């Protein structure tokens, strides 16, 4: 009589795993002011409202001539140029029966109510300007506040600053912005088979050795998200070394991210090491590649019991706890990359309080 096989583990679906993971990712509270020039990719800690209108006054959207439409009601008319208004200067009131030479971005002079583009004008030998087509009031004029009205919220709290957003912040005169502090992330790989590119030539590689590619792309991905990354290198395949690395990293980081060692082999030490210092809440998910994924907490004192879901009690227990979030990625590079994009990236953005 053969023994019954133990029931197979039911893997958590990706959507359920992500929802549970994000439940543990409470936004960081620290903020800092940084120069707008240096704020690319950072997340706003407060909304930005404009103290001015953009543009600040009516201005020309074309190179041409500012006119009074009433002066041109009779059709083709030749008028003298009474003034010249380049961008950055302010003209005088436009005299009746005259035009003002005006350039793109220059303020519309008082009395003018349209701009005729220079292609629709003929400059005669005597300097008079003949208008070929009668303009409509408001033609080629950008109105004050057309882009941004005074008091309008232009960027929301929790918005990640893009190059376009930085330009918008600068357009309302902001040289500095308040952003969420950078998450501190400790990164290390596990595996005695790993070697660093440049340290060993391909022809000198020992049988079974591979180059540590995960270290490079994971650090780059974290940096692009705005993290402050501590690269802790490669940890040997033994439990004591793994525990020591986790314990040390938990003292001064918000998140510990590892690659490798999260499966169920005899040389996979991440699971017991994390459980000895804290707890695991997620272990393996129903995706391929990427099944060997783990989430937990590393600290001197486990803030919640192992396996507790992201309930209000569990989340409350994490607040103020001494330690760090832990995420373990598979060692396979493709699996590691996929699980980072699907799970780690949204987790980090939630830590940053990102709303999109």
Located regions from the model:
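N-terminal intrinsically disordered, low-complexity, charge/repeat-rich segments that act as generic
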Residues: 1-21, 222, 255, 269-275
């Amino acid at each position: 009589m053969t023994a019954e096989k133990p029931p197979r583990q039911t893997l958590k679906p990706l959507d359920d795993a992500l929802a549970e993971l994000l439940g543990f990712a409470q936004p960081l509270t620290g903020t800092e002011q940084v120069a707008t020039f240096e704020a690319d990719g950072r997340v706003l800690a407060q909304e930005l409202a404009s103290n001015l209108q953009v543009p600040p006054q009516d201005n020309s959207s074309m190179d041409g001539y500012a006119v009074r439409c009433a002066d041109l009601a009779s059709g083709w008319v030749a008028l003298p140029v009474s003034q010249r208004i380049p961008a950055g200067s302010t003209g005088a009131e436009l005299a009746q029966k005259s035009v003002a030479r005006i350039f793109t971005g220059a303020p519309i002079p008082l009395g003018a109510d349209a701009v005729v583009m220079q292609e629709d004008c003929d400059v005669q030998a005597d300097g008079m300007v003949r208008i070929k087509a009668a303009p409509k009031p408001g033609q080629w004029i950008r109105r004050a506040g057309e882009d941004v009205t005074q008091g309008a919220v232009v960027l929301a709290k929790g918005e990640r600053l893009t190059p376009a957003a930085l330009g918008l912040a600068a357009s309302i005169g902001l040289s500095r912005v308040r952003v969420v502090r950078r998450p501190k992330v400790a990164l290390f790989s596990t595996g005695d088979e790993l070697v660093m590119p440049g340290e060993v030539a391909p022809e000198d590689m020992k049988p079974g050795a591979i180059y540590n590619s995960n270290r490079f792309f994971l650090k780059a991905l974290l940096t692009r998200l705005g993290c402050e990354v501590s690269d802790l290198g490669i940890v040997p395949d033994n439990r004591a070394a793994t525990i020591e690395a986790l314990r040390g990293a938990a003292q001064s980081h918000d998140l510990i991210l590892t690659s490798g060692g999260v499966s169920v082999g005899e040389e996979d030490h991440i699971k017991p090491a994390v459980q000895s210092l804290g707890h695991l809440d997620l272990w393996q998910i129903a995706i391929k590649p990427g099944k060997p994924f783990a989430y937990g907490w590393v600290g001197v004192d486990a803030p919640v019991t192992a396996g507790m879901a992201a309930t209000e009690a569990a989340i409350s227990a994490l607040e103020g706890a001494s330690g760090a979030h832990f995420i373990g990625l598979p060692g396979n590079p493709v699996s590691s990359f996929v699980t980072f994009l699907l799970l780690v990236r949204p987790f980090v953005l939630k830590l940053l309080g990102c709303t999109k």
